[in-house]
Amino acid sequence: IEKLRSRYTVVVLTVLSWSIAVDCSRHNGISWDGILSCEFLGHYKPDAEAYQKGADLLRLEPDQAMMVAAHAGDLQAAMKAGLHSAYVHRDGESFGIFGELDSAPEWDVNARDFAELERLLLTQVSTTA
């Protein structure tokens, strides 16, 4: 995540309360540029307003933001709200696209883990910048 933060603003959009998200992040040694709790936004995922309001608070148009998740429902809702999507496989939490397909065509980015996501997104930036 640190390498991604060198090029992108990395913010969590979570259904957890802000305090629980902060505690979980600290416990796992993860630093974010920000944490947006649906509790604060007044709209919960998968409501499109949660994603749109999150982008708005970051002064972004939805198509300037990307939802990264291991859950199809999160990604589908984010795409309906106008965001880009990145699927990251997480054992025990993800559906099994990598056992069957090289990628799921509906997502903008498909990664086997966060290291691959980092490589794909940083390569994408350097080739398009």
Question: Predicted regions span which residues?
Answer:
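Asp-based, Mg2+/Mn2+-dependent phosphohydrolase catalytic module
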Residues: 13-129
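Catalytic-core regions built around general acid/base machinery
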Residues: 1-7
